[in-house]
Amino acid sequence: MFKTRKVVIVGAGHVGSHVALALIQSGEADDIVLIDILKEKAAAQALDLDDCVSGALCGHDAKIRAGEYSELNDADILVMAFGRSRRPGETRLDMFDDSIKMANEVISHLKQVDFKGIMISISNPADIICEHIRRKMNWEPNRCFCTGTSLESYRLLRVLSAATGYRRKSIQAFCMGEHGNSSFVVWSAIRIGSKSFAQLRAERPELAALSLDDLQLQVKRAGDIEVDGKGCTEFGIANAACMLIKAIFHDQKLIWPCSTALNGEYGQKNVAAGVPCVIGKNGIEEILELKLTEEEHAKFAASCDILRGFLDRAASL
């Protein structure tokens, strides 16, 4: 018997529904369950998504439906996508109080089931919500992580491609730290083809003329532009979640920045932050420690300090 790949998504709003759509269209899940406090909405989203299964873009006949937390007892992957959208002018950290209340409600349901799979969290503030849930549930760090700086890294690839003329898939680049304002570009690790970005800048005057500060600002402002213009972000982050789910189901050993609990890596403990990881069938299978510059180390430490402070607050609520 072939195993059915079952994914449960908590939160059937903009992000959760698009994660489901990405899974349906990519064929990366066989059984998809939507859970939402608004049960009629979850049922309606599931019905609408089920209509897609008949379409030409769907690779196979995935089953999708609304359900309850008991569905987690035999689920492979749990995606946390609950919470409201970020408002214009608001940072992800500004969502802390509302999101922690929702997280604690979700935790009360999780404690009533026997979930043994892998959790991928998207709900903002992403690093904090994910690690808060992990600690309350006493889950192993490898099976409880969040999309972290995936969006920042996607945006960085877009910005670098536009600035250099190289296609995105030829560029290796990512951001580290908080999924938020204290994230930063790891310039020292960027490679295009077989060359480092620093080497290419030394060889090409037009690349040397690029302002790294301006490029990083473009990465950071992208989310604000999207939220100001449409009220949310949904497509990119859903794609990132689907990519991670695929890496787990296919044991791809994908190297990608995710937010996971740190135990001495990069000199940090008692915090979860975005770092390059190896993702496979066991979730986070390895944390890759890069040789950061002194400035990059300082930025990462500062980002971790911010996250640690909010995690301490979450523990007291």
Give the location of each predicted region.
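Aromatic pocket-lining residues of Rossmann-like dinucleotide-binding sites
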Residues: 23
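C-terminal substrate-binding/catalytic lobe of Rossmann-fold NAD(P)-dependent dehydrogenases
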Residues: 137-143, 152-317
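Rossmann-like NAD(P)-binding element
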Residues: 57-117
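Glycine-rich Rossmann-fold phosphate-binding loop(s) that bind the pyrophosphate
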Residues: 12-13
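Conserved N-terminal Rossmann-fold NAD(P) cofactor-binding segment
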Residues: 37-74, 308-315
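N-terminal Rossmann-fold NAD(P) dinucleotide-binding loop
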Residues: 16-17
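Rossmann-like NAD(P)(H) cofactor-binding subdomain of soluble oxidoreductases
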Residues: 91-157
